[in-house]
């Protein structure tokens, strides 16, 4: 397998459909056109032609599009064949194309990878293609499109350019100490560094929003049996996702629902009631419940309000609270307010949010929805926003740490070489986002998660 091979893949989803598309990229795409179509179509014009087998018989007929490189998605010669979407027809056409020497099936994401390697896209834009395909809401799709069009990359490149100018100034002062460049008296370096750090903080804040929009928040509903966990899942989901009975321990396994609150994706997980297991099936369900709790972004501690008047989670169930991960945020949900007559709404107890509601009637559930949105700092007005991945957040955080360390050098003993090194490392972290400095292993992991024909 060589990166110089001409590659082919189906660009439409597998299965039956009105249209099926095969995409070919590489220097032999021209030969494919001449062999299968009998001619080379006019560049960037749709041509309706028969697709022929080796013996001259017609396999299908459809539209052929020819994009000679470098003016194509991948930067190479690209041919697209748009025929009927039957799997048998597409398979016959694909087999015909693969009889031509030098062609092979594309790896997942290889078309986008070639676009990146040929400077048609930077890495953040290439990732945005997959994010746009996987978008689960209108807001996520718009933000992914913004990233694909370069919104995120432009912000990162602006930071990289600012760091370049700052490094030039610092390193000139180090290399030419006899020149009249005084770091401390004019304050230029500190002022420029503060500007870069402020811009970086703004990008980090937007990236956290973009990551939340892409990844969603994992919320686990946990508590004793018959506290109303499954009823709350149904209320949040707006449908009967879980079986609800008066029998304690009805839920034996993990149930998952994917919902949106004003565009924010939420992964709601209902778990088995926590108690001493009565049988092996329940024991496994409780083990899985704790596994989900340990991986949660937030736990909704469900309390049956008819069984206790306590509101402090440490008082309600100290053993449960003691077992939770130290920094895991919890929200206490006192359920069955329709029976207890408690006042609906939210308050705070010892640093924990406390919400009184009725999962059965739905009263107070909107308060919980707003709380979940606000607890993650989600901004529903993200016009011009972009999507971000975990690796982007890590790169931005590392860049911020290097700038903080560089500023400490500047304001402390003034070690010019150490400041210059911190600036270089921060610039490298930022450049990893767009792919200016990226290892081959990382590229492989990123593009292998793409669709085959992308």
From Swiss-Prot:
Binding site for (6S)-5-formyl-5,6,7,8-tetrahydrofolate: 23, 80, 120, 454
Cofactor(s) the protein needs: K(+)
UniProt xrefs under InterPro entries: G_TrmE, GTP-bd, GTP-bd_TrmE_N, GTPase_MnmE, MnmE_dom2, MnmE_helical, P-loop_NTPase, Small_GTP-bd
Gene Ontology process terms (BP): tRNA methylation; tRNA wobble uridine modification
Domain of life the protein comes from: Bacteria
Domain TrmE-type G: 216-377
EC main group: hydrolase
Pfam families reported for this sequence: MMR_HSR1, MnmE_helical, TrmE_N
Binding positions (GTP): 226-231, 245-251, 270-273, 335-338, 358-360
EC nos: 3.6.-.-
GO molecular function, one term: metal ion binding
Cofactor binding comment, as recorded: Binds 1 potassium ion per subunit.
Keyword line: Cytoplasm, GTP-binding, Hydrolase, Magnesium, Metal-binding, Nucleotide-binding, Potassium, tRNA processing
UniProt binding sites for Mg(2+): 230, 251
UniProt keyword Magnesium present: yes
Entry GO CC: cytosol
Binding site for K(+): 226, 245, 247, 250
Record localization: Cytoplasm
Subunit structure: Homodimer. Heterotetramer of two MnmE and two MnmG subunits.
Protein's job: Exhibits a very high intrinsic GTPase hydrolysis rate. Involved in the addition of a carboxymethylaminomethyl (cmnm) group at the wobble position (U34) of certain tRNAs, forming tRNA-cmnm(5)s(2)U34.
Similarity comment: family membership: Belongs to the TRAFAC class TrmE-Era-EngA-EngB-Septin-like GTPase superfamily. TrmE GTPase family.
HAMAP family (UniProt xref): GTPase_MnmE (MF_00379)
The protein, known as: tRNA modification GTPase MnmE
Species the sequence originates in: Shigella flexneri
């Amino acid at each position: 397998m060589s990166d110089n091979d001409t590659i082919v893949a189906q660009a439409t989803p597998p299965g039956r459909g009105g249209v099926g598309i095969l995409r070919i990229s590489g220097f032999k795409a021209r030969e494919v056109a001449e062999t299968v179509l009998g001619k080379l179509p006019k560049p960037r014009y749709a041509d309706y032609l028969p697709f022929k087998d080796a013996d001259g018989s017609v396999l299908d007929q459809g539209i052929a599009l020819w994009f000679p490189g470098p003016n194509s998605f991948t930067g190479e010669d690209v041919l697209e064949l748009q025929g009927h979407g039957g799997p048998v027809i597409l398979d016959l056409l694909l087999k015909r194309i693969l009889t031509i020497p030098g062609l092979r099936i594309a790896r997942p994401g290889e078309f986008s990878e070639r676009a990146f390697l040929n400077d048609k896209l930077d890495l953040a834009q290439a990732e945005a293609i997959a994010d746009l395909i996987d978008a689960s809401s209108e807001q996520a799709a718009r933000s992914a499109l913004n990233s694909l069009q370069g919104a995120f990359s432009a912000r990162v490149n602006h930071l990289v350019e600012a760091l370049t100018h700052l490094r030039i100034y610092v390193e000139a002062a180090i290399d030419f100490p006899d020149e009249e460049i005084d770091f401390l008296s004019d304050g230029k370096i500190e002022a420029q560094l503060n500007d870069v750090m402020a811009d970086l903080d703004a990008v980090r804040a937007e990236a956290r929003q973009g990551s939340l929009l892409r990844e969603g928040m994992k919320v686990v509903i946990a508590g004793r049996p018959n506290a109303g966990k499954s009823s709350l899942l149904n209320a949040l989901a707006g449908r009967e996702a879980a079986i609800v009975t008066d029998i304690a321990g009805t839920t034996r396994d993990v149930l998952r629902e994917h919902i949106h609150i004003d565009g924010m994706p939420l992964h709601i997980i209902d778990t088995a009631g926590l108690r001493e297991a009565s049988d092996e099936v329940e024991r496994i369900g409780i083990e899985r419940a704790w596994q989900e709790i340990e991986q949660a972004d937030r736990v909704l501690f469900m309390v049956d309000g008819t069984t206790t008047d306590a509101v402090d989670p440490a008082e309600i169930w100290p053993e449960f609270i003691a077992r939770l991960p130290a920094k895991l945020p919890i929200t206490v949900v006192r359920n069955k307010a329709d029976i207890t007559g408690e006042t609906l709404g939210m308050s705070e107890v010892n640093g924990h949010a406390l919400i009184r509601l009725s999962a059965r009637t739905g009263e107070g559930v909107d308060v919980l929805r707003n709380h979940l949105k606000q607890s993650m700092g989600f901004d529903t007005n993200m016009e011009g926003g972009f999507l971000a991945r975990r690796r982007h957040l890590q790169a931005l955080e590392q860049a911020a740490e290097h700038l903080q360390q560089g500023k400490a050098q500047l304001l402390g003993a003034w070690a010019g070489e150490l400041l210059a090194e911190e600036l270089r490392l921060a610039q490298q972290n930022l450049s990893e986002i767009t792919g200016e400095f990226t290892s081959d292993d990382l590229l492989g992991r990123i593009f292998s998660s793409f669709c085959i024909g992308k």
